[in-house]
């Protein structure tokens, strides 16, 4: 049985991870949970999974959580009260929890960086759903992985697809996972993108896009932030940077293809011109399950893919006019150093302000480009962790400042 720590248990990745644990109780045991403010859901998760430690983001909620757990303990719905913690200390403790074999990092954004590093330093394997950690701090995370021997298993569908295609190759047989070493034997990878909420919109119509429009994904069920990232194609741009670190590829070896059906999750082109692809229904539970069960596969009762029911699979090149964030991500990745951290932080803050209706959808790439341009003269090619955290904070403040001076609030 594999013991699992779930960081971000009430979010999209966290809840799906716990669903899998419930489906396979003989395979997985949940030993640690971290969550935000959704106490009702956390209580249900504690009752179901009986973890050893629980941490909340907000310390002020600990008293209420403790009281409610005491009641459940008295009623024998909880066998043993878990250790209760809060804040950064609790998050890092859960990430490095002694009995955990695997840590699922489902926290959105750069907030997942420090607990990811805590897990790595403790020698834990990670199921990485928090791509921003690797993007912002790849120069720190990759050396930490090499030092600890931890393995980074990609939990998003695209990188999981590449990872699955590489099983049995020299890369998988001879390398520690995710050390950034060059991948022998293949020419390139092709990351597929659904095209997001606006794939059928004309570029000139995006000026009218609302928050509701941007958070309505045609294929996937995800959180609001990543759904907006899908709509801008920044999500795919960030995945390009992640793939660079995961598989040791140059940016010229990583291609983005629009595939509206989201059935082919990504492809690997080998040196001999063969192409390997991983197919499946657009369901995040499958890549999460593969992380949890790897190197084994588990039999599931989930719906089977029947291509005859789908009929056609279509592909096209992304429209750079409609998706300027894609090119911003390639540029930041090629610049290296602290530039991806600036890109990531600026994007996170810009999306946050858009979701608050502080400015328009089309302003997201404008803000990000302005902040990245401003950082060029201060680019640090070999940053420390403290320098990455400092530049992350700087970029967020710059987005606020820029938006107040240059952006008009959404009005339709």
Swiss-Prot record:
Q: Quick one: which residues bind Mn(2+)?
A: 156, 158, 239
Enzyme Commission number(s) of this protein = 1.1.1.267
An example molecular function term from Gene Ontology annotations: manganese ion binding
Function field: Catalyzes the NADPH-dependent rearrangement and reduction of 1-deoxy-D-xylulose-5-phosphate (DXP) to 2-C-methyl-D-erythritol 4-phosphate (MEP).
- Pathway(s) this gene product operates in, as recorded in its UniProt entry: Isoprenoid biosynthesis; isopentenyl diphosphate biosynthesis via DXP pathway; isopentenyl diphosphate from 1-deoxy-D-xylulose 5-phosphate: step 1/6
**What is the designated name of this protein?**
1-deoxy-D-xylulose 5-phosphate reductoisomerase
Per UniProt, the keywords (alphabetical) are: Isoprene biosynthesis, Manganese, Metal-binding, NADP, Oxidoreductase
Which branch of life, at top level?
Answer: Bacteria
Q: Which InterPro entries match?
A: DXP_reductoisomerase (IPR003821), DXP_reductoisomerase_C (IPR013644), DXP_reductoisomerase_N (IPR013512), DXPR_C (IPR026877), DXPR_C_sf (IPR036169), NAD(P)-bd_dom_sf (IPR036291)
Q: Which GO terms describe its biological process?
A: isopentenyl diphosphate biosynthetic process, methylerythritol 4-phosphate pathway involved in terpenoid biosynthetic process
For the ligand (1-deoxy-D-xylulose 5-phosphate), the binding residues are 131, 157-158, 194, 217, 230, 235-236, 239
Gene that produces this protein = dxr
Q: Which family does it belong to?
A: Belongs to the DXR family.
What this protein needs as a cofactor is: Mg(2+); Mn(2+)
């Amino acid at each position: 049985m594999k013991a699992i720590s779930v960081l971000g248990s009430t979010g999209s990745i966290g809840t799906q991870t716990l669903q899998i644990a419930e489906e396979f109780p003989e395979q997985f045991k949940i030993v640690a949970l971290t969550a935000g403010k959704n106490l009702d859901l956390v209580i249900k998760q504690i009752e179901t999974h009986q973890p050893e430690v629980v941490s909340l983001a907000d310390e002020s909620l600990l008293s209420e959580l403790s009281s409610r757990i005491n009641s459940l303990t008295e009623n024998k719905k909880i066998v043993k009260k878990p250790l209760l913690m809060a804040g950064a200390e609790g998050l890092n403790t859960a990430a490095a929890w002694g009995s955990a074999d695997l840590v699922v990092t489902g926290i959105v954004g750069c907030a997942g960086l420090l607990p990811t590093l805590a897990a790595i330093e403790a020698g834990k394997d990670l199921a990485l759903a928090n791509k921003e950690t690797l993007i912002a701090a790849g120069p720190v995370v990759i050396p930490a992985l090499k030092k600890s021997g931890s393995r980074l298993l990609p939990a998003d569908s695209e990188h999981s697809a590449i990872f699955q295609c590489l099983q049995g190759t020299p890369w998988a047989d001879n390398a520690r996972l995710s050390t950034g070493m060059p991948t022998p034997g293949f020419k390139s990878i092709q990351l597929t993108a659904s095209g997001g909420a606006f794939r059928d919109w004309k570029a000139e119509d995006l000026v009218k896009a609302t928050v509701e429009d941007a958070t309505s994904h045609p294929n996937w069920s995800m959180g609001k932030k990543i759904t907006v990232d899908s709509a801008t194609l920044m999500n795919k741009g960030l995945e390009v940077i992640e793939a660079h670190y995961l598989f040791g590829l140059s940016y010229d070896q990583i291609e983005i293809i629009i595939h509206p059906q989201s059935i082919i999750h990504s492809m690997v082109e080998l040196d001999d011109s063969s192409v390997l692809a991983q197919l499946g229904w657009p369901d995040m539970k499958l890549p999460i399950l593969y992380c949890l069960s790897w190197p084994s596969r588990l039999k599931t009762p989930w719906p089977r893919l029947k291509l005859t029911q789908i009929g056609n699979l279509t592909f096209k090149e992304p429209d750079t006019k409609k998706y300027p964030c894609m090119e911003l991500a390639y540029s930041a990745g090629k610049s290296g150093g602290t530039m991806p951290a600036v890109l990531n932080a600026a994007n996170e803050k810009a999306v946050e302000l858009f979701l608050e209706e502080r400015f328009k959808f089309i302003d997201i790439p404008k803000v990000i480009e302005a902040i990245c341009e401003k950082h060029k003269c201060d680019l640090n090619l070999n940053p420390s962790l403290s320098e990455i955290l400092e530049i992350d904070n700087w970029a967020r403040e710059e987005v606020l400042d820029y938006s107040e001076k240059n952006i008009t609030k959404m009005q339709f």
